[in-house]
Amino acid sequence: MNHFWSDRIQSIGTLDSSRKLRFSDRFQNAYTELFRLEEGARILEIGCGTGALCRALKRWYPSAEVVGLDRDDAFIDYARERNTGETYRKGDATALPFADGSFDVTISNTVSEHVEPSGFFGEQRRVLRDGGVCLLLSARRGIQHPAACVREESAFEMEIWERVDADFRRAAKENGVGAYALNEMELPAAMEKYGFRDVETHYLAINLTPDDPFYTPEEARDMINANRQNDLDNIERMESVAPGAVSKADRDRLVRLVNERYDRRLALYEAGEKQWDVTLGLTMLLRGVK
Protein backbone atom coordinates (compact mmCIF):
# COMPACT_ATOMS: atom_id res chain seq x y z
CA MET A 1 0.00 0.00 0.00
CA ASN A 2 1.39 3.39 -1.00
CA HIS A 3 0.53 6.14 1.50
CA PHE A 4 3.79 8.06 1.16
CA TRP A 5 2.33 11.29 -0.18
CA SER A 6 -0.66 11.40 2.17
CA ASP A 7 1.47 10.44 5.20
CA ARG A 8 4.56 12.57 4.60
CA ILE A 9 3.84 15.32 2.06
CA GLN A 10 0.21 16.47 2.06
CA SER A 11 -2.48 14.99 4.27
CA ILE A 12 -5.98 14.13 3.14
CA GLY A 13 -7.65 16.88 5.17
CA THR A 14 -5.40 19.64 3.88
CA LEU A 15 -5.62 18.53 0.25
CA ASP A 16 -9.39 18.08 0.23
CA SER A 17 -10.29 21.27 2.10
CA SER A 18 -8.03 23.47 -0.03
CA ARG A 19 -9.15 21.95 -3.35
CA LYS A 20 -12.83 22.15 -2.46
CA LEU A 21 -12.39 25.89 -2.00
CA ARG A 22 -10.45 26.33 -5.24
CA PHE A 23 -12.89 24.22 -7.25
CA SER A 24 -16.02 25.64 -5.67
CA ASP A 25 -18.96 26.20 -7.99
CA ARG A 26 -18.47 29.90 -7.28
CA PHE A 27 -15.53 29.75 -9.70
CA GLN A 28 -17.16 27.39 -12.22
CA ASN A 29 -17.55 29.92 -15.03
CA ALA A 30 -13.95 31.09 -14.72
CA TYR A 31 -12.72 27.53 -15.24
CA THR A 32 -15.19 26.28 -17.83
CA GLU A 33 -14.77 29.31 -20.11
CA LEU A 34 -11.10 28.37 -20.43
CA PHE A 35 -11.57 24.58 -20.47
CA ARG A 36 -14.02 24.71 -23.42
CA LEU A 37 -15.02 21.06 -23.11
CA GLU A 38 -17.90 19.27 -24.79
CA GLU A 39 -20.64 17.56 -22.83
CA GLY A 40 -20.31 13.80 -22.79
CA ALA A 41 -16.51 13.89 -22.90
CA ARG A 42 -14.43 11.14 -21.34
CA ILE A 43 -12.13 12.98 -18.90
CA LEU A 44 -9.07 11.64 -17.07
CA GLU A 45 -7.63 13.54 -14.12
CA ILE A 46 -4.02 12.61 -13.42
CA GLY A 47 -2.98 12.99 -9.79
CA CYS A 48 -6.57 13.34 -8.60
CA GLY A 49 -5.74 13.24 -4.89
CA THR A 50 -8.95 13.20 -2.85
CA GLY A 51 -11.14 13.71 -5.92
CA ALA A 52 -12.21 17.33 -5.33
CA LEU A 53 -11.56 18.38 -8.93
CA CYS A 54 -13.13 15.19 -10.31
CA ARG A 55 -16.29 15.87 -8.31
CA ALA A 56 -16.34 19.46 -9.58
CA LEU A 57 -15.94 18.25 -13.18
CA LYS A 58 -18.86 15.88 -12.70
CA ARG A 59 -21.02 18.77 -11.41
CA TRP A 60 -19.97 21.08 -14.24
CA TYR A 61 -20.26 18.43 -16.99
CA PRO A 62 -22.99 16.04 -15.75
CA SER A 63 -22.94 13.82 -18.85
CA ALA A 64 -19.14 13.45 -18.84
CA GLU A 65 -17.40 10.24 -17.84
CA VAL A 66 -14.85 11.32 -15.24
CA VAL A 67 -11.95 9.07 -14.22
CA GLY A 68 -9.46 9.99 -11.50
CA LEU A 69 -6.02 8.40 -11.13
CA ASP A 70 -3.52 8.68 -8.28
CA ARG A 71 -0.63 6.59 -6.96
CA ASP A 72 -1.57 7.08 -3.28
CA ASP A 73 -3.95 4.41 -1.97
CA ALA A 74 -5.29 6.62 0.83
CA PHE A 75 -6.32 9.31 -1.63
CA ILE A 76 -8.01 6.80 -3.92
CA ASP A 77 -9.91 5.17 -1.03
CA TYR A 78 -11.08 8.58 0.19
CA ALA A 79 -12.19 9.65 -3.29
CA ARG A 80 -14.07 6.39 -3.91
CA GLU A 81 -16.00 6.75 -0.66
CA ARG A 82 -17.18 10.22 -1.73
CA ASN A 83 -17.69 9.67 -5.45
CA THR A 84 -20.68 11.29 -7.13
CA GLY A 85 -20.52 9.24 -10.30
CA GLU A 86 -16.79 9.31 -11.04
CA THR A 87 -14.43 6.31 -11.27
CA TYR A 88 -11.10 6.15 -9.44
CA ARG A 89 -8.04 4.02 -10.14
CA LYS A 90 -4.59 3.69 -8.67
CA GLY A 91 -1.82 4.26 -11.20
CA ASP A 92 1.34 6.03 -12.28
CA ALA A 93 1.26 9.23 -14.35
CA THR A 94 4.17 7.94 -16.46
CA ALA A 95 2.56 4.53 -17.15
CA LEU A 96 -1.16 5.18 -17.48
CA PRO A 97 -3.21 1.95 -17.32
CA PHE A 98 -5.40 2.88 -20.29
CA ALA A 99 -5.48 2.08 -24.00
CA ASP A 100 -4.27 4.46 -26.69
CA GLY A 101 -6.81 7.11 -27.66
CA SER A 102 -9.25 6.26 -24.89
CA PHE A 103 -9.93 9.79 -23.54
CA ASP A 104 -11.20 13.08 -24.93
CA VAL A 105 -9.59 15.16 -22.19
CA THR A 106 -6.73 14.83 -19.72
CA ILE A 107 -6.37 17.27 -16.85
CA SER A 108 -3.95 17.69 -13.96
CA ASN A 109 -3.66 20.14 -11.10
CA THR A 110 -0.29 20.83 -9.40
CA VAL A 111 1.17 17.56 -10.71
CA SER A 112 3.51 18.48 -13.57
CA GLU A 113 6.19 19.86 -11.24
CA HIS A 114 6.61 16.44 -9.62
CA VAL A 115 6.79 14.26 -12.77
CA GLU A 116 9.45 13.90 -15.48
CA PRO A 117 8.07 15.84 -18.48
CA SER A 118 8.57 13.32 -21.30
CA GLY A 119 6.63 10.65 -19.41
CA PHE A 120 4.06 13.10 -18.09
CA PHE A 121 3.17 14.64 -21.45
CA GLY A 122 3.95 11.55 -23.52
CA GLU A 123 1.50 9.33 -21.67
CA GLN A 124 -1.27 11.92 -21.84
CA ARG A 125 -0.76 12.28 -25.57
CA ARG A 126 -0.90 8.51 -25.96
CA VAL A 127 -4.24 8.06 -24.16
CA LEU A 128 -5.88 11.06 -25.86
CA ARG A 129 -7.79 10.65 -29.11
CA ASP A 130 -6.76 12.75 -32.09
CA GLY A 131 -8.06 16.25 -31.40
CA GLY A 132 -8.25 15.53 -27.68
CA VAL A 133 -7.51 18.27 -25.15
CA CYS A 134 -4.76 18.36 -22.52
CA LEU A 135 -5.43 20.76 -19.62
CA LEU A 136 -2.71 21.56 -17.13
CA LEU A 137 -3.20 23.62 -13.97
CA SER A 138 -0.07 24.76 -12.17
CA ALA A 139 0.11 26.83 -8.99
CA ARG A 140 2.17 30.00 -9.26
CA ARG A 141 3.38 32.28 -6.49
CA GLY A 142 0.33 33.94 -4.94
CA ILE A 143 -0.35 36.13 -1.92
CA GLN A 144 -0.83 35.02 1.67
CA HIS A 145 -1.33 37.28 4.66
CA PRO A 146 -2.64 35.46 7.78
CA ALA A 147 -4.57 37.32 10.44
CA ALA A 148 -2.41 38.62 13.30
CA CYS A 149 -4.12 36.32 15.81
CA VAL A 150 -3.17 33.30 13.67
CA ARG A 151 0.32 34.47 12.77
CA GLU A 152 1.52 34.69 16.39
CA GLU A 153 3.83 31.84 17.38
CA SER A 154 5.30 31.09 20.78
CA ALA A 155 8.99 30.37 21.34
CA PHE A 156 7.94 26.79 22.13
CA GLU A 157 6.39 26.38 18.68
CA MET A 158 9.25 28.02 16.82
CA GLU A 159 11.79 25.74 18.52
CA ILE A 160 9.88 22.60 17.57
CA TRP A 161 9.43 23.61 13.94
CA GLU A 162 13.12 24.46 13.69
CA ARG A 163 13.87 21.01 15.12
CA VAL A 164 11.97 19.15 12.38
CA ASP A 165 12.51 21.53 9.46
CA ALA A 166 15.33 19.49 7.93
CA ASP A 167 13.25 16.30 8.18
CA PHE A 168 10.33 17.86 6.30
CA ARG A 169 12.68 19.15 3.62
CA ARG A 170 14.28 15.74 3.27
CA ALA A 171 10.89 14.01 2.94
CA ALA A 172 9.94 16.40 0.14
CA LYS A 173 13.23 15.86 -1.68
CA GLU A 174 13.07 12.07 -1.35
CA ASN A 175 9.65 12.03 -3.01
CA GLY A 176 10.64 14.38 -5.81
CA VAL A 177 8.45 17.26 -4.69
CA GLY A 178 8.97 20.06 -7.19
CA ALA A 179 11.86 18.24 -8.86
CA TYR A 180 10.58 19.07 -12.36
CA ALA A 181 9.14 22.54 -11.80
CA LEU A 182 9.05 24.68 -14.95
CA ASN A 183 8.54 28.42 -15.19
CA GLU A 184 5.85 30.27 -17.11
CA MET A 185 7.90 30.19 -20.33
CA GLU A 186 9.12 26.62 -20.01
CA LEU A 187 5.73 24.96 -19.39
CA PRO A 188 4.06 25.86 -22.71
CA ALA A 189 7.32 25.12 -24.53
CA ALA A 190 7.38 21.65 -22.95
CA MET A 191 3.79 20.99 -23.96
CA GLU A 192 4.68 21.85 -27.56
CA LYS A 193 7.90 19.84 -27.43
CA TYR A 194 6.01 16.69 -26.50
CA GLY A 195 3.51 16.91 -29.32
CA PHE A 196 0.68 19.27 -28.43
CA ARG A 197 -0.48 22.05 -30.74
CA ASP A 198 -2.54 25.23 -30.36
CA VAL A 199 -1.14 25.66 -26.86
CA GLU A 200 -2.77 28.46 -24.85
CA THR A 201 -1.78 29.98 -21.50
CA HIS A 202 -4.16 31.64 -19.07
CA TYR A 203 -4.01 32.76 -15.44
CA LEU A 204 -6.73 32.49 -12.80
CA ALA A 205 -6.67 34.34 -9.48
CA ILE A 206 -8.68 32.61 -6.76
CA ASN A 207 -9.30 35.11 -3.97
CA LEU A 208 -10.01 33.57 -0.56
CA THR A 209 -10.68 36.48 1.80
CA PRO A 210 -13.06 35.51 4.62
CA ASP A 211 -14.02 39.11 5.46
CA ASP A 212 -15.07 39.91 1.89
CA PRO A 213 -18.90 40.17 1.87
CA PHE A 214 -18.80 38.55 -1.58
CA TYR A 215 -18.59 35.24 0.32
CA THR A 216 -21.25 33.63 2.48
CA PRO A 217 -20.59 33.03 6.20
CA GLU A 218 -20.30 29.30 5.46
CA GLU A 219 -17.64 29.96 2.81
CA ALA A 220 -15.76 32.31 5.14
CA ARG A 221 -15.69 29.71 7.91
CA ASP A 222 -14.50 27.09 5.43
CA MET A 223 -11.59 29.35 4.43
CA ILE A 224 -10.52 29.85 8.03
CA ASN A 225 -10.88 26.18 8.86
CA ALA A 226 -8.98 25.08 5.74
CA ASN A 227 -5.96 26.97 7.08
CA ARG A 228 -6.54 25.40 10.49
CA GLN A 229 -6.62 21.97 8.86
CA ASN A 230 -3.32 22.61 7.11
CA ASP A 231 -1.62 23.58 10.38
CA LEU A 232 -3.08 20.61 12.26
CA ASP A 233 -2.11 18.17 9.52
CA ASN A 234 1.48 19.43 9.60
CA ILE A 235 1.59 18.54 13.29
CA GLU A 236 0.04 15.13 12.65
CA ARG A 237 2.67 14.36 10.00
CA MET A 238 5.54 15.05 12.39
CA GLU A 239 5.76 11.51 13.69
CA SER A 240 5.93 9.93 10.22
CA VAL A 241 8.36 12.55 8.89
CA ALA A 242 10.58 12.88 11.99
CA PRO A 243 9.95 9.81 14.19
CA GLY A 244 10.73 10.44 17.85
CA ALA A 245 11.78 14.05 17.34
CA VAL A 246 8.72 15.51 19.08
CA SER A 247 6.93 13.85 21.99
CA LYS A 248 3.21 13.17 21.89
CA ALA A 249 2.73 15.60 24.77
CA ASP A 250 4.42 18.36 22.80
CA ARG A 251 2.42 17.53 19.67
CA ASP A 252 -0.77 17.69 21.70
CA ARG A 253 0.28 21.07 23.06
CA LEU A 254 0.90 22.30 19.51
CA VAL A 255 -2.59 21.17 18.52
CA ARG A 256 -4.13 23.07 21.44
CA LEU A 257 -2.27 26.25 20.53
CA VAL A 258 -3.30 26.04 16.86
CA ASN A 259 -6.94 25.46 17.75
CA GLU A 260 -6.92 28.36 20.21
CA ARG A 261 -5.64 30.72 17.51
CA TYR A 262 -8.16 29.65 14.89
CA ASP A 263 -10.97 29.71 17.45
CA ARG A 264 -10.02 33.35 18.09
CA ARG A 265 -10.05 34.04 14.35
CA LEU A 266 -13.52 32.55 14.01
CA ALA A 267 -14.74 34.55 17.01
CA LEU A 268 -13.49 37.76 15.41
CA TYR A 269 -15.30 36.87 12.20
CA GLU A 270 -18.54 36.15 14.03
CA ALA A 271 -18.22 39.46 15.89
CA GLY A 272 -17.78 41.34 12.61
CA GLU A 273 -14.23 42.46 13.47
CA LYS A 274 -12.59 42.33 10.07
CA GLN A 275 -8.97 41.20 9.80
CA TRP A 276 -8.73 41.16 5.98
CA ASP A 277 -6.45 38.13 5.98
CA VAL A 278 -6.13 36.77 2.47
CA THR A 279 -4.97 33.77 0.51
CA LEU A 280 -4.84 34.55 -3.19
CA GLY A 281 -3.97 31.55 -5.32
CA LEU A 282 -2.63 32.21 -8.80
CA THR A 283 -3.11 29.29 -11.16
CA MET A 284 -1.52 29.00 -14.58
CA LEU A 285 -3.82 27.10 -16.93
CA LEU A 286 -2.51 25.59 -20.15
CA ARG A 287 -4.65 24.09 -22.90
CA GLY A 288 -3.19 22.05 -25.73
CA VAL A 289 -4.61 19.83 -28.46
CA LYS A 290 -3.29 16.48 -29.69
What are these regions (language model features)?
Residues G119-V133:
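A short glycine-rich, Lys/Arg-flanked "PGG" loop and its adjoining helix->strand segment in the class I
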Residues R22-E39:
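Conserved alpha-helix/loop element of class I SAM-dependent methyltransferases that forms part
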Residues A139-Q229:
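Conserved catalytic/acceptor-binding region of the Class I
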Residues V105-S118, R140:
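A short SAM/SAH-binding and catalytic strip from SAM-dependent methyltransferases
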Residues L44-I46, T50-A95:
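Class I SAM-dependent methyltransferase SAM/SAH-binding core
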Residues T94-V105:
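A short acidic, Gly/Pro-enriched loop at the edge of an enzyme's catalytic core
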Residues N2-R26:
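Class I SAM-dependent methyltransferase Rossmann-like catalytic core
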Residues Y180-M185, E200-V289:
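Conserved Class I S-adenosyl-L-methionine
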